[in-house]
Structures are given as structure tokens and as C-alpha cells.
Design a protein with these regions (language model features):
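Short S/T/G/P-rich N-terminal loop/turn motif that feeds into the first structured element of a domain
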Residues: 2-74, 84-90, 103-177
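Metal-dependent nucleotidyltransferase catalytic core
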Residues: 92-98
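Conserved RNP beta-strands of RNA recognition motif
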Residues: 77-79
Length: 177
């Protein structure tokens, strides 16, 4: 299991690696089908975005977000950049992000930096960490590859985990249907 702790950086400057998560909400059936298709079709375009390092395309879950039932209206793009200026410029000017914005009824990008990172993602260590011990909002990205023999055990625990997340007063953002 990999866990990555990221700090929200509303005004980050300098040459620190920046991590962005861009969320897109799609309203019509047509735009939702477009977004789903882009999970496969955007790969070639993402690798050509100027300045992008590691990147991943995400779907989202429904209700408390941690369920096997997908939320077909919200998708996200996680990416690393060498600095904030490159991230902002590429997010604004690249054709693929412009297409996502054109299709979406709502979009939001969070700029962050990695505080800690443990494990690999697709065989890579995607985040350069710069521990700052900052007080403020944190984003935690947890991902895992599940072995088939562990699936039943994993999904049995999901309802309790979802309930804990949903009732935690410290959770300031979650994707709703």
C-alpha cells in the first residue's frame, strides 16, 4: 500500500515540485461518456503536456467515495510539475486540459507539495518530498493493488471505513454525487 501526504499550497512559489489534482464534473450523458472514454484516450495526450512529470487519471466513488459503485460524473487528473509556474501555465494552455474544461460543467484544481511519500506507483516514486511540518490542510492519497485472495476481506471493511470518513468533522472536501 502506498500513502502520500500532501499539503495544500495556495501561494507556493519557487522551484519545489508541485502536485496538482484537477477535478472535473460532467453533467450530460454525452459528456460523461466522453470523460469515461478519456480514461483511455487521454494517455497519449497527457504524456505530451509541457512540463508534466508523473500523472494519473482517476475516476471517483459514490457516497462517501470509498465504494465499488463509481460516480460517473466526476473524474480527476493528478500530475507532478517542476514548479508552480510550469503547472499553472500547462494547466491553462495545454489542449487536453482545455478539452476537459470545455466538456465539464465544473472544474477545480488544487496545488500541493508532497510532505511524505511511501511506496511506489506504477513502479515509480512520483513525489519529491519537502517536509515543512506546516499546520494546515492535508490531502492524503492512499492506493493499493489488491490481490484476488484479499478482495473479500478488503470489501468487508469498506462500509466501516466509509462511515468513519463520512462522520469525521476534519474532512473538508469530498466528492458528492
Amino acid at each position: 500500500m502506498c500513502q502520500h501526504i500532501l499539503t495544500h499550497l495556495p501561494g507556493a512559489q519557487g522551484m519545489t515540485q508541485i502536485v496538482t489534482i484537477s477535478f472535473f464534473r460532467f453533467g450530460s450523458v454525452r459528456s460523461r461518456l466522453w470523460a469515461f472514454a478519456m480514461m483511455g484516450l487521454a494517455r497519449g495526450q497527457m504524456s505530451r503536456v509541457p512540463g508534466v512529470g508523473f500523472w494519473k487519471l482517476f475516476g471517483s466513488g459514490s457516497n462517501e467515495g470509498f465504494t465499488p459503485k463509481p460516480n460517473v460524473s466526476v473524474y480527476a487528473v493528478l500530475a507532478t510539475w517542476p514548479d508552480r509556474q510550469t503547472a499553472a501555465r500547462s494547466l491553462q494552455q495545454s489542449a487536453i486540459f482545455a478539452r476537459y474544461r470545455q466538456q465539464a460543467i465544473e472544474n477545480w484544481t488544487v496545488f500541493m507539495k508532497a510532505e511524505t511519500a511511501r511506496g511506489k506507483w506504477s513502479g515509480q516514486t512520483p513525489f519529491s518530498t519537502t517536509p515543512q511540518n506546516q499546520n494546515g490542510p492535508l490531502a492524503v492519497i492512499t492506493r493499493a493493488t489488491l490481490r484476488p485472495r484479499k478482495l473479500a476481506q478488503f470489501w468487508r471493511r469498506v462500509p466501516n471505513i466509509s462511515q468513519v470518513i463520512g462522520q469525521d468533522p476534519n474532512v473538508v472536501f469530498k466528492i458528492e454525487n
